[in-house]
Amino acid sequence: GGTELALMCDYIIAADTKNTRIGLPEIQLGIFPGYGGLYNTIKRMGDFNALNFILSGKPMPAKIALKQGLVDQVVMPSGLLQAAVNFQEFVKRPKGRILGSKSRSFLAVALRKEVEKKADPRFYPAPYALIDHWKTFGADENVEKDSIAVQSLFDSPEARGLMRCFHLQDGLKK
């Protein structure tokens, strides 16, 4: 989606409007962000914030995305072009904290416990698959590993059902 595409950029500028929302809703569709989405989110936000953001599946306003490190700058829509032209002058953003394998193992247990309160793995395997994938690979930039993990979820009956629900709800909004 759009957020994953933006995450591939070195610098992200978001418009400061009440309707600007930045999100990775894939978990609600029974999959998780692949194709570098997981890696790039961790790289920007750090492991803990990135996983909480991805596991929620909920979009965040631009100003919160700025505080979390997901975007680099938030400007009024009328200033987007000028901000893009001047982006080289902007201070380099700090990298998110990336955890080692021992820390990931510890945090994975805590994340699974939190997810278990909200989602039964029989019906919502994606959050558990995301945690397991992250625990194993961390912020390793390997699109092939991400693609394989996401594809196995994409082909599942749970994901097909969640995607159908999404499309039905989306159709009701129109």
Regions found by a protein language model. Give the residues of each.
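CoA-thioester-processing core
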Residues: 1-54, 68
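Amphipathic alpha-helical segments at domain termini/boundaries
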Residues: 4-7, 50-152, 160-174
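Conserved mixed alpha/beta core segments that line enzyme active sites in large multi-domain catalysts
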Residues: 156
